[in-house]
Amino acid sequence: MHLDEGFDDDLDEERVPNLGIVAESISQLGIDVLLSGETGTGKDTIAQRIHTISGRKGRLVAMNCAAIPESLAESELFGVVSPAYTGADRSRVGYIEAAQGGTLYLDEIDSMPLSLQAKLLRVLETRALERLGSTSTIKLDVCVIASAQSSLDDAVEQGKFRRDLYFRLNVLTLQLPPLRTQPERILPLFKRFMAAAAKELNVASADVCPLLQQVLLGHEWPGNIRELKAAAKRHVLGFPVLGVDPQSEEHLACGLKSQLRAIEKALIQQSLKRHRNCIDAASLELDMPRRTLYRRIKELQI
C-alpha cells in the first residue's frame, strides 16, 4: 500500500487540531489510535503524519485490509514459518512484525474478517505474536493506527466487527469530518490546491469565477478532500470541472459583485438542503433574520 509522503501542516492541523500534541502523546503512552472518516478525508495522510511526529525509529507499515484476500490475510498480517501450509515454501515476515520499532497502519479495518479480528486483538493486548506455523513468541514494539470508512458502532451492532476489538481500538478516536459539512473550507482549500498544482506543473494558476464557485459550493464532494484536490488540478490544466468549462464566456466574467452573489446563493442552498428546507433552522445557522432570508431566496431565485 502506497502512502503520499507530502504533508500540509496547516491542512493537517485543520483536520486534527493539536495534531503534534496528539502524536507525541500516542508515542509516549503507547496507545492505539482509530481514525474514522469517509473516503478522501485524509486518514492516510494523518496516519503518516502521526508516525512522523511521534519520532519512532522504525518505519510506517501500511496494510489495506480490504485489498488482501481472506485466504491470505492471516499469513500476510502475522507472517509464516515454512512449511506452515501447502505453498508456503519459505518463511516470511508479516505486516505486524515488519513494523517492529515503528508504526503499523491498518487501513479499512472495518473490512477485516471476523476470524482475523480475534487474533489481532490478542496481539494488541499482549504486544506479542506467533508466526503462522510457529510456537515461538515474538515480542513487539509497535504503535498501531487503524482507520475505518464506515461506523464501527454500526458494524458491532450488525455483528460484523468484534465489540472487544472495537473497545481496544477506541481509546483514542480521531474523527475526520466530510467536506460537505464544512462548506466554508471548500473555496479556500480549492484555491490552495490550485496554487500547489500550478507550482507542481510549472504553469500559471487560474481564476475561479462566480459560476464555478457556485458549483463548487453546491457539490456534495463524496470523494472529499481527495476529490477537491483533483478538481483543482484539472482546473489549473484548463479542463472542465464539474461541468464548468474554464474557457466559457460566463466563466470569464468574474466581477466582485457577481462572485459575492454566487457565494451567497450557494451557502443558502446548502443550508436549506442540510435542514430539509426548514427556514427557521437555516436562518439560525446563517445568522440571518427569517424575513431577510425569505427575501434573499426570492431575489437569488433559489
Swiss-Prot record:
Gene3D superfamilies: 1.10.8.60, Homeodomain-like (1.10.10.60), P-loop containing nucleotide triphosphate hydrolases (3.40.50.300). Pfam families: HTH_8, Sigma54_activat. ATP binds at residues 37-44, 99-108. One of its GO terms (biological process) is symbiont-mediated perturbation of host programmed cell death. Keywords: Activator, ATP-binding, DNA-binding, Hypersensitive response elicitation, Nucleotide-binding, Transcription, Transcription regulation, Two-component regulatory system. GO terms for molecular function: ATP binding; ATP hydrolysis activity; sequence-specific DNA binding. The keyword Cell membrane does not apply. SUPFAM superfamilies: Homeodomain-like, P-loop containing nucleoside triphosphate hydrolases. It comes from the Bacteria. Residues 9-237 form the Sigma-54 factor interaction domain. Residues 279-298 bind DNA. Member of the two-component regulatory system HrpR/HrpS that regulates the activation of the sigma factor hrpL which itself induces the expression of hprD as well as other hrp loci which are involved in plant pathogenicity, hrmA and avr genes. Probably interacts with sigma-54. This is Pathogenicity locus probable regulatory protein HrpS. The lineage of its organism: Bacteria, Pseudomonadati, Pseudomonadota, Gammaproteobacteria, Pseudomonadales. The gene is hrpS.
